[in-house]
Every structure is written in C-alpha cells, then in structure tokens.
Amino acid sequence: MAMQLSLSHQSWAKSLASPITSFDPARSPPKRVELGPNCLNGGATAGKLMREKVGERMRMSGRSCCVKASLETAVGAESETLVGKVTEVDKDTFWPIANGAGDKPVVLDMYTQWCGPCKVMAPKYQELAEKLLDVVFLKLDCNQENKPLAKELGIRVVPTFKILKGGKIVDEVTGAKFDKLVAAIEAARSS
C-alpha cells in the first residue's frame, strides 16, 4: 500500500489539536504526547517537548515531529476505513496499521506474486474481508523490499496468514487452508 500524505498548515493544526500517540520503533506500549501550535513553526519548543515526553527513542527536529505526528494521526484515522477490503501493506506501513487497529483482529496474508496457492486464496480472502467488518485484512508481498518484515514475522512458506490482536501475533495459518484460516479468525474475534 502506498500512502500519499498531503499536509497543509491547516491540516497540521487540525491533526495536532488533540493528543497523539508517539512513534516507537521498538513497538513498546505507546506514550501520549501533546503538541501545540509551536510545532507549526517547527520551533524548538515542540522538539524539546517531544524529547522530554518521549525521551531518546525519538530524535527529530520540531518540524519533523509535526510531520511524523501528522502521519501517525492519518494512519490511525485510515485504519478506521480499512474494514471491508484487503489493504496492501509494506515494511513501513504494516506495524502502524496493525498497532492502530486497537482491539480489532488483524489478519495479514503474506504471499508472493508467483505462488499458485496464494492466487487461489486471494479471492476467498477478499470475500472474508467484505463479510467480516470487525476485522482488518492486510496483505504483504514477500518480495525483496519487504524481506526484513517477512523475516521479523518468521515466514517460512507462502501463503502464511498471521492473526494479530492488540499488536501481538496470536495465531498463524500456513498454506492454502481456508477452513483453518476462518477458524483462527473466529477464535481471535471471540477472544
């Protein structure tokens, strides 16, 4: 999924009017950070506030804090519109979307372009996404570009389906086993 983000001064002000969740590359529990109008100027106050509240994990100038904060707000808002469809993700967009889903189960289809069983599962996976509106359905092309994420998630065969809840992997289905996938999703929905 390629996310296009266009920010004007007004959109920055709107997205930064309320608290945001800070970016944490280690994916530890998110921290709340308040940014105000000083961030619009890229002033030192915003950068200082960000460093004081978040600590050394985030090394950014005030202006880049604004952009990152606005991006995170956009990703959080976008995760609400992900229901009812399958969304293509990559190594940069997967974790923000998965963590932004809150209590909704997230199902990640890890596939390759050349995989026959992956192609068989794709329309069935799409039907599930249209039917189960309380679940976020994602797919990741396990190409060279996304290899670091595939390795992090422990993929060994394609297709592999990872089921996450609360940003943590709760189940895995390997191969084109549709019935097992449905059962794993139902278990995640009811937990």
Curated annotation (Swiss-Prot):
The record marks 109 as: Deprotonates C-terminal active site Cys. This is Thioredoxin F-type, chloroplastic. GO terms for cellular component: chloroplast. The lineage of its organism: Eukaryota, Viridiplantae, Streptophyta, Embryophyta, Tracheophyta. It is found in: Plastid, Chloroplast. Pfam families: Thioredoxin (PF00085). Belongs to the thioredoxin family. Plant F-type subfamily. Participates in various redox reactions through the reversible oxidation of the active center dithiol to a disulfide. The F form is known to activate a number of enzymes of the photosynthetic carbon cycle. Disulfide bonds join 115-118. Residues 68-190 form the Thioredoxin domain. The record marks 116-117 as: Contributes to redox potential value. It comes from Mesembryanthemum crystallinum (Common ice plant). Keywords: Chloroplast, Disulfide bond, Electron transport, Plastid, Redox-active center, Transit peptide, Transport. Forms a complex with heterodimeric ferredoxin-thioredoxin reductase (FTR) and ferredoxin. Its main location: plastid. The active site is at residues 115, 118. CDD domains: TRX_family (cd02947).
